[in-house]
Every structure is written in C-alpha cells, then in structure tokens.
C-alpha cells in the first residue's frame, strides 16, 4: 500500500488487488481491481470516476459488487505483448464551501505480465 497525498490534503491509499501474472486468454482482456481508501471526510464517494491508464489510453472501471471501496475493469493486451504497465486515476468531487470542487488522485504504476501463448 502506498500513500499518495492529494492537492487538497487527503491521504489516499491504493491497494492493487490484481495478480501480477495472468494466463493469456483468447479474448485478450485481463481483469484488474483496486481498493482505494481516503481519509478525507468531505469526499463525495458517489462522484468517483475511476479509470485504468495504459500509456495514453484510459479504460473505465466499475464498482465491485457488494463492496464500497473497490473497482474493477479490463485491460486489453494484444497478442505477442507480455508486459503491460498501468496505473489507476480517480477523478472525484469533495464538499467545500459553496459548491463541490473537483480533484483527482493517481496510483503508483503497476506491471501486469501475461504468460502462455
């Protein structure tokens, strides 16, 4: 777990729940999952828009069923590629004087290795 400070003073911890190595599959789509904890009480949890970032491409994530702070999505890995580097970006709003304000946080970079043919 790595703590990443946000611009507005929130301590955020990402926990990557994705196996580092996955078997190659015919669909070329690989599941990734993360948990995010934030100490900021003013965070508007219903405003979170998480993404998986691979290079300059962003892939959407969905809330993990029955969990309050976990999200999951899929990373495409083309045939012949054995390593993908990715990170998570969470855009959200927090309550402030007046109206809610936007903010975001980014996880450390992770590596997914694909084995098999």
Positions of the model-derived regions?
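Sec-dependent bacterial lipoprotein signal peptides
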Residues: 1-10
